[in-house]
């Protein structure tokens, strides 16, 4: 059976030679991202800054392309469209307009008129202004979701492996997330509930990649008791390199269409996922692994049963 090999089986790349460069680069980018988070800050979407919510039903399946074009030309800032329920039901969200409640009503009336002109027969079923308190609650819930996901992953790694692996995984995840947030700050892309979904997806992908590498490290710790930890980590990464690169490449290729032709709703999501796949893959090699090396092999090897390996050959009865 044919097996695709992106790298030869006996590859021996000394990844740990680049551990300092990897950690320093990662720390620099994460610190810069934190600074950018505070200044100039994130471009919060309608979900997190309030706005106007309009529910409408079109006579036929909604034409989202025409609606985006028509509503986007009103000059009212961000306009988000979402299908809910049937294909005829449309949820329209506008950013909050300058002024008081009367200004919000004027904006809603403009949307009504545009809907009637673009898709005659459309019924507006609900108009509601989303205040700052609701938006703040959505933002808090999004942050809570990321925090709970982080804790759950820490506990999973901690119980499946040892605390050193859990610490390395969580520190690496934090560095990964800060870079993604910095990307949002630099590009000015909307930070909304879709952004939260993208970050959670990247977190899941990243931890899965690290579990594969960590599992091989744990296995090799039991097999090669006398091998220096630095060499063992390099060996483990090289042994899983085909799997890591293959998974990353397949994920990357599957997300490219979202980033290129996903439309307004999915394009930002796809772009962030592409960046996240790259960050997660490189961090498994140049961040998570060096953290284990710095924790020291005495802690990692403690309690590991003796096994055959270089310098510790198996004995036969």
Predicted regions and their residues:
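A structural signal for conserved, well-ordered secondary-structure elements
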Residues: 1-317
